Amino acid sequence: MIGKTKKILIIGSAPDSVNATKWKNLSFDNIVTINNAWKIRKDWTNSIYPEDFPVNQRPKANEKQTLHSSDEYVEAQNHFGGFVYAGGTMAFTAGYWALFRFKPQIICYTGCDMVYKGEKTHFYGKGTADPLRKDKTLNNLLAKSARLEAIAFINKCKILNLSNIPESKLTFTKVNINDLDNISRINLNKIKEEKINLALQKEKKTGYFVPDGKYWKKMDKFEKKEIKIIDNLWLSSIQQEIEV
């Protein structure tokens, strides 16, 4: 007997995330919203945000909804190698947390392409582009995305991008939400396991692990060139056309 495919939707705050309001009869087991994205759909099940996210901007959960912050996601991110290698921004943190918490077969992203152009950078107007802040862990967003996709792969999970904007800092295969029921027909990225092994070995050897998750307090201990080598290994693990 074939088990049910567990699918998770992660919604970010990009301008196009509002397209998710039009989606009907969703077959996701959980809908995870990042920061303010809980405002997009009332049927979200999990709201995730950093510990410094303003209390007055957090949602009020009903009996079918739960709130999650650093007291949970630090453990999840550490399980998969820690923040320095994974990238210290919520788009990636939410993915690792969902992978750890739900052990799904499919994770779909929307509104998380991390492209900030024009006056309206978020669905609610102009916001802070957190992934573009000065941070050694975020110098190559494509590489951090490739890492998440590769780590999901070895955990028997596919990651897809439901956004339809032409530019993205995510490596995930773009699909139409109407095609999710025919996942076997989608031409997914090819994953190179030998490259994954090399990247994981390099991470272990480098040893940039901060147990409490507060990596920014030890930023001076991390060498840009070492992180770049690791990032390039992760990029090489995903076979796709990438515009850097």
Question: How would you name each of these model-derived features?
Answer:
Residues 1-244:
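Metal-ion/cofactor- or nucleotide/acyl-coenzyme-handling active-site neighborhoods
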